[in-house]
């Protein structure tokens, strides 16, 4: 049994890659990423210390603060 695989000589079309825009960019009709501010880490850590001090410490280590 012989399997014929299409090659570029046999008419397979090459797809041209179009670079995608960065996050939040793009002027196309598709959905766009929301433009949101980065949360204030000091406020997050203060709230986390009230709830669970150990979790706040682990978060601080994980984020490099």
Swiss-Prot record:
Cross-referenced Pfam families: UBact
Cross-link Isoglutamyl lysine isopeptide (Glu-Lys) (interchain with K-? in acceptor proteins) mapped to chain: 65
Biased composition (Polar residues): 1-17
Basic and acidic residues compositional bias, start-end: 35-65
Chain segments carrying region Disordered: 1-65
GO MF terms, alphabetically ordered: protein tag activity
Alphabetized InterPro entries for the sequence: UBact (IPR037543)
The entry's keywords: Isopeptide bond, Ubl conjugation pathway
Family designation: Belongs to the ubiquitin-like protein UBact family.
Function comment: May function as a protein modifier covalently attached to lysine residues of substrate proteins. This may serve to target the modified proteins for degradation by proteasomes.
Protein name as it appears in the record: Prokaryotic ubiquitin-like protein UBact
Source organism: Methylacidiphilum infernorum (isolate V4) (Methylokorus infernorum (strain V4))
